[in-house]
């Protein structure tokens, strides 16, 4: 990449007659000095960019995406209005995907409940979450082996907050989920064990409460969620120490 940038800048910087005529291969001292200056500037820029990513704790090839969850436009008045954020990070093409799920607006129930979250085929929200299509299934396999079958998430006091790693989906390559929809369902995923056709298609997860379209992003949304994750772990440890 650095060599490519250098080449482009050099082509733009050198006079036109440098590349024509019998003496095209002979560079004067001024031109050589100009090449050295350009190389030094490009190297400085590249090092600054690399150091910036390193300071953020991110490798240069890390990929990020964000999905801002909103209630489906087709919900009945009695259904809950779920909203929030899903942020993704992949340290490079071929690396495993990880995500933070931060959602609220679920009913506050006495017992812990679980809700299914899946990636659906289309990023089309023109008819709410109903127009996102079926599960994204590029390899034509049965549920729950779809790349975006994220499974069930525990809801406590009307909120869902979870970090998950090792997800099968990807932000890169021919099966990227960027531009597709994340859908939050009203029910629990039976993980293909329901004994009917719907079970191996969608896990009998029920109506679609909320959804969003996955979009590429910078590292900032991930950094904020990672900070909250670290603070939660710290509070949990402190609570355990006090209880002991």
UniProtKB/Swiss-Prot annotation:
CDD domains given in the database record: Cu-Zn_Superoxide_Dismutase
Biased composition (Basic and acidic residues): 226-244
Top-rank taxon, per record: Eukaryota
Alphabetized UniProt keyword annotations: Antioxidant, Copper, Disulfide bond, Glycoprotein, Golgi apparatus, Metal-binding, Oxidoreductase, Secreted, Signal, Zinc
Single GO MF descriptor: superoxide dismutase activity
Glycan attachment residues as annotated in the record: 111
Cofactor note: Binds 1 copper ion per subunit. Binds 1 zinc ion per subunit.
Signal peptide region: 1-18
Enzyme Commission number(s): 1.15.1.1
Cofactor (UniProt): Cu cation; Zn(2+)
GO cellular component annotations of the record: collagen-containing extracellular matrix; extracellular region; Golgi apparatus
Positions with a binding annotation for Cu cation: 118, 120, 135, 185
Compartmental location: Secreted, Extracellular space; Golgi apparatus, trans-Golgi network
Binding-site residues, Zn(2+): 135, 143, 146, 149
Residue pairs linked by disulfide bridges in the UniProt entry: 67-212, 129-211
InterPro entries, sorted: SOD-like_Cu/Zn_dom_sf (IPR036423), SOD_Cu/Zn_/chaperone (IPR024134), SOD_Cu/Zn_BS (IPR018152), SOD_Cu_Zn_dom (IPR001424)
Predominant cellular place of this UniProt entry's protein: secreted
Gene3D superfamilies attached to this UniProt entry: Superoxide dismutase, copper/zinc binding domain
Catalytic activity: 2 superoxide + 2 H(+) = H2O2 + O2
PANTHER family associated with the record: SUPEROXIDE DISMUTASE CU-ZN -RELATED
Functional description taken from the UniProt entry: Protect the extracellular space from toxic effect of reactive oxygen intermediates by converting superoxide radicals into hydrogen peroxide and oxygen.
Self-association and partners: Homotetramer. Directly interacts with ATP7A; this interaction is copper-dependent and is required for SOD3 activity.
Protein family membership: Belongs to the Cu-Zn superoxide dismutase family.
Name this protein carries in UniProt: Extracellular superoxide dismutase [Cu-Zn]
Taxonomic source organism: Oryctolagus cuniculus (Rabbit)
